[in-house]
Amino acid sequence: MTPPPTVAVRDARADERDAVRVLTLRAYAEYATVMTPASWAGLDGAVRAALASDAPAERIVAERDGVLLGSVHLFPPVVDAYGALAGRAPWPELRLLAVAPEARGLGVGRALVAECVRRARRAGASALGLHTSASMRVAMAMYERLGFERAPEHDFQPPGAELVQGYRLRLE
């Protein structure tokens, strides 16, 4: 899993926080049309809260020619990336993977996931986890192509919303 040559992956700078927020909200806006209103309200609120949070996470971006194309957060294993809903897993958690609509199909998501895998391995993690839902079909298919497997013991269901499905990539 190596990034496409035209996409640079790096840590987000502090002055890019608002740009990352705007990019992420634009990327996730498509789900408003495919989720139930309750599921969308829950996801939108959770994404906005996570973006505003100062929780310890590595904030990673992908860019080309100085233009942000995508972002992801990588939470350490000691941090509960979803509050009390999912509980803590013993591995890092990839969250808020977002690719600008105009950059889809360029390998940006794959490059960001590859960077999370690289960092998790460097930290000595035995696995890398993530959560997704049936509404996120394109992302789910990409995760499965990259070797992530279902970890249903880490599923959770917010009240009135669709099931949030746990996935894990074994790194050992």
Locate the predicted segments by residue.
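Actinobacteria-biased recognition of intrinsically disordered, low-complexity terminal regions
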Residues: 1-5
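Acetyl-CoA-dependent GNAT
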Residues: 11-17, 22-101, 113-115, 119, ...
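Conserved glycine-rich acetyl-CoA-binding loop
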Residues: 96, 100-114, 121-123, 134-141, ...
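C-terminal "cap" of GNAT-fold acetyltransferases
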Residues: 13, 26, 87-92, 126-129, ...
